[in-house]
């Protein structure tokens, strides 16, 4: 089939390369978000998908208004039979959805109808789900609600960060998307409606929502930290200093100190403990402003934290 591939971040690259390499499909163009400011200088940089497409000689479309009449006409001139989507990052209007005769097929990183929205992997980890996966479905105007073509499942490991899990789903999801498009091209695949029950939402996580709430119990804090690693990144105030946090330790072999109030900090020779709504939690790595990730105990000794300082 003649395909237009729509995607933006690195997560979309396995699917893009798989479709370009497929003998059954012809990726005639890539649709991605406009160049965005990056780095300290704020210089506009192409998206990872744009860079990969250009390296492979695929034309790149970067409309600032993808639902405009002008872009709908531009896409229509390309005459794609189907459009494949992986984390494009913009809502698609009715006119755009009506361009390809086989519609728009989206790869979503959850087992729909669970975790519809922009942050399904993060939501699954934060909720403590044991299993998640990826789903291919036909895009319709409402959010992630279209009929399903296929799914692949993935176990969530106890130490998975969102980055770890998304990396695996990007690879297995690429296989699923390719197989889905093969089935559509052959006329052998029919989408089925999503169940009405089991719908949960996974909106984008803001920086403020990634702030650790120490009054919560340890299992919830630990999952939430993994869920926002690497982006937007867990953080807390230690005194008046904003510090990013890496995944924390849940090691039964290390005896925690006595009870600590939520946010209270205790530093010993090898560990930094913070009080929570349950037992104290041992920090792993921290990233003070302007520095790289480092061992929490090493940082605490160097910073000479006042015994009265708290995390908040």
Curated annotation (Swiss-Prot):
One Pfam short name: Formyl_trans_N
Gene3D superfamilies the record matches: 3.40.50.12230
Residues annotated for (6S)-5,6,7,8-tetrahydrofolate binding in this entry: 110-113
Transferase among keywords: yes
EC number from the UniProt entry: 2.1.2.9
Superkingdom classification of source: Bacteria
Alphabetical list of PANTHER family matching this protein: METHIONYL-TRNA FORMYLTRANSFERASE, METHIONYL-TRNA FORMYLTRANSFERASE, MITOCHONDRIAL
Family designation: Belongs to the Fmt family.
Protein name: Methionyl-tRNA formyltransferase
């Amino acid at each position: 089939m003649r395909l237009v591939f729509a995607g933006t971040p690195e997560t979309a690259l396995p699917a893009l390369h798989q479709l370009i390499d497929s003998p059954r499909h012809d990726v005639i163009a890539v649709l991605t978000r406009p160049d965005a400011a990056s780095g300290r200088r704020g210089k506009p940089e192409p998206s990872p998908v744009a860079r990969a497409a250009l390296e492979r000689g695929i034309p790149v479309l970067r409309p600032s208004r993808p639902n405009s009449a002008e872009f709908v006409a531009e896409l229509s001139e390309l005459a794609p039979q189907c459009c494949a989507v992986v984390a494009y990052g913009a809502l698609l209007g009715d006119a755009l959805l009506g361009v390809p005769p086989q519609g728009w097929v989206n790869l979503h990183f959850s087992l729909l109808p669970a975790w519809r929205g922009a942050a399904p992997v993060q939501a699954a980890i934060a909720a403590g789900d044991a299993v998640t996966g990826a789903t291919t479905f036909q895009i319709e105007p409402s959010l992630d609600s279209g009929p399903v073509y296929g799914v692949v499942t993935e176990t969530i490991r106890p130490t998975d960060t969102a980055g770890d899990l998304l990396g695996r789903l990007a690879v297995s999801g690429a296989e699923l998307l390719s197989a889905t498009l093969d089935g559509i091209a052959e006329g052998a695949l029919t989408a089925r409606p999503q169940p009405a029950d089991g719908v949960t939402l996974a909106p984008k996580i803001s920086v403020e929502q990634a702030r650790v709430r120490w009054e919560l119990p340890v299992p919830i804090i630990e999952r939430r930290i993994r869920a926002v690693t690497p982006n937007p990144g867990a953080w807390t105030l230690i005194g008046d200093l904003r510090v990013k946090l890496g995944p924390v330790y849940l090691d039964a072999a290390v005896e925690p100190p006595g009870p600590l109030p939520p946010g209270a900090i205790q530093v010993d020779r090898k560990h930094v403990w913070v009080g929570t709504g349950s037992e104290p939690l041992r920090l792993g790595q921290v990233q003070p402003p302007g520095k790289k990730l480092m061992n929490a105990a090493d940082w605490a000794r160097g910073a000479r934290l006042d015994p009265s300082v708290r995390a908040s």
